[in-house]
Amino acid sequence: MSDAPSSSPDATASHWCYHCNKRVVVETLDDFVVCCECNKGFVESIQPTPAAYSSPAPPQPLSPDLNVEDSSIGSHFLQMLRLLAHAPSQRSPPRHLDVLSYEDDFFRLELNSRNEIDDDEDEDEDDGDEEEEDEEENLTVNDEEDEEDDLRRRNRFPLTTTQSRTGRNRILDWAEILMGIEDNSIEFRMESDRYAGNPADYIDDAAGYEALLQNLAEGDGGGGGGRRGAPPAAKSAIEALETFEVSSSEGEMVMVCAVCKDGMVMGETGKKLPCGHCYHGDCIVPWLGTRNSCPVCRFQLETDDAEYEEERKKRTSTVSDSAAASSSSSTSRY
């Protein structure tokens, strides 16, 4: 075997090594480019970076439509967005990578490896059986390395393509954001104490929360100004309820108290409302102490609330008048 030819290292890191995953200096060995660090041939020449990506563009002056001073928060915010939009990506692989470049590199590696194999066969065709076995082992190793290089190249191609597209999309997104900010008049101001809507709808401190909880409790508790529904029945109306004793005839009807859902047995006493429904005395009296209506038919007893009684009379008179009018109209038709 002859000595390896002299190498001519490239002074600048103009290639990307996919084995080292960084920019490297390469050596040229008979038109075969290898990495100086890992001595692998899985390298790619980096195209010259376009001027658009070479250096970040200087911040442009703010649009006069914003009417914001240079020392304001809006000015610094827009400048920061512009710097982020033009910031170059760090340690990114070559940008101009396509399918043809990968295929060309693959064929170049394949041809170089095959040429080396042919040269080895020509030089070693007079050697013994041991050298032939070594040559077969070398061929197997080279084929395995070629397959590994091919697999790595195919796995890295979607990743590098996605990274390059993501970088371009990121710049376009920032450009759209900046254009939208400059096209629309946006006022940058510090947080103020002004409210949107009615200031009474806001709760600023613990006292406000306590007042809110108190109002909710009063609304659900049924006492004070938060009472809902009809008022309790008058004490005179409760005392005037008819008391009866369950007889044999009534026991056969299987009377059931609608409050406790228990049957009333023969010989037991109960209370009867004017509507005719019967209950246990211990059940209906507490019920009427909170509301004046019958649990079954909603018949209303008198109350001690004068305002409620006045409204009930008005409703009753209105219903009676409408019923009389409807009956008279139906009679006139016939």
Curated annotation (Swiss-Prot):
The cross-references to InterPro entries, in alphabetical order and at most eight, read:
RNF126-like_zinc-ribbon, Znf_RING, Znf_RING/FYVE/PHD
Segments for region (Disordered): 111-158, 307-334
Q: What is known of its domains?
A: The RING-type zinc finger domain is required but not sufficient for ubiquitin ligase activity. It mediates the interaction with the RING finger of COP1.
Q: List the disulfide bonds.
A: none
Q: Name one GO biological process term.
A: protein ubiquitination
Q: Which UniProt keywords apply?
A: Cytoplasm, Metal-binding, Transferase, Ubl conjugation pathway, Zinc, Zinc-finger
The record's principal subcellular location, in a coarse class, is cytoplasm
Q: In which pathway does it act?
A: Protein modification; protein ubiquitination
Would you tell me the Gene Ontology cellular component terms?
Answer: cytoplasm
| One Gene Ontology molecular-function label | ubiquitin protein ligase activity
Q: By its UniProt entry, which PANTHER family does this protein fall under?
A: E3 UBIQUITIN-PROTEIN LIGASE PRAJA, OS06G0633500 PROTEIN
One Pfam match, given by its short name, reads zf-RING_2
Descriptive protein name: E3 ubiquitin-protein ligase CIP8
Q: Where is the composition biased (Acidic residues)?
A: 117-149
- Residue spans annotated as Zn fingers (RING-type) read 257-298
Subcellular location field: Cytoplasm
Q: How does it assemble?
A: Interacts with the RING finger of COP1. Interacts with UBC8 through its N-terminal region.
Superkingdom per UniProt: Eukaryota
